[in-house]
Amino acid sequence: MAQPQNVPTFKLVLVGDGGTGKTTFVKRHLTGEFEKKYIATLGVEVHPLHFHTNFGEICFNVWDTAGQEKLGGLRDGYYIQGQCGIIMFDVTSRITYKNVPHWWRDLVRVCENIPIVLCGNKVDVKERKVKAKAITFHRKKNLQYYDISAKSNYNFEKPFLWLARKLVGNPNLEFVASPALAPPEVQVDQQLLAQYQQEMNEAAAMPLPDEDDADL
């Protein structure tokens, strides 16, 4: 079957501290993993993730750092022409959340006013350290937030759906078919996830704390 022409395609910049699960997350999408390309000059892997919506196909070219962030900052070439972003932290590691403002600053410095989703990964791990009430950065900066678990596929599609709606400018856009995902490596405790969702809802209703140095 011939590929439809002119599939809307967006550059998605995936950032966050090393070890937060960014590569694990992007590799869940099997066709994207199969079709990825390596850009040697920047040391990045670009994964084309296709999603089928009620308005046709959409593609995110997800730029993954391939671990460079562990060696220091990322070069501007990584961010240039980024049309949307995902900032990832690890809910079992407070320092990765504390560093979110630095990643956000880098993103908006180069990409300016793009839609960004903040994702707290590894919610399948029982020892959660970054609790819902501590996650306020997205509210201060008008980002979307999702708890995710890359290894279990929990909420995998949510960040992409939110970004697609923003980029296309249509809140009624829906994904009509699930992409082929790698089988879950871990199981999530549904009761625990329901509790987390409840805590997020309650936290969202609370007034924001005063600005503190950690979020500057």
UniProtKB/Swiss-Prot annotation:
Amino acids binding GTP: 17-24, 67, 121-124, 149-151
CDD domains, per the entry: Ran
Modification sites for Phosphothreonine: T20
GO molecular function: GTP binding; GTPase activity
Tagged with keyword tRNA processing: no
GO biological process: poly(A)+ mRNA export from nucleus; protein import into nucleus; ribosomal subunit export from nucleus
Cellular component annotations (GO), alphabetically ordered: cytoplasm; cytosol; nucleus
Residues spanning the membrane: none
Region of interest (Switch-II), ranges: 67-83
Alphabetical list of InterPro entries matching this protein: P-loop_NTPase, Ran_GTPase, Small_GTP-bd, Small_GTPase
Switch-I: annotated segments: 36-44
Ranges of residues in domain Small GTPase Ran-type: 6-170
Compartments, as annotated in UniProt: Nucleus
Statement: the UniProt record of this protein carries the keyword Endoplasmic reticulum: no
Keywords: GTP-binding, Nucleotide-binding, Nucleus, Phosphoprotein, Protein transport, Transport
Family as reported in the entry's similarity comment: Belongs to the small GTPase superfamily. Ran family.
Assembly behavior: Oligomer of dis3, pim1 and spi1. Found in a nuclear export complex with RanGTP, exportin and pre-miRNA. Interacts with fft3.
Record function comment: GTP-binding protein involved in nucleocytoplasmic transport. Required for the import of protein into the nucleus and also for RNA export.
Name by which UniProt lists this protein: GTP-binding nuclear protein spi1
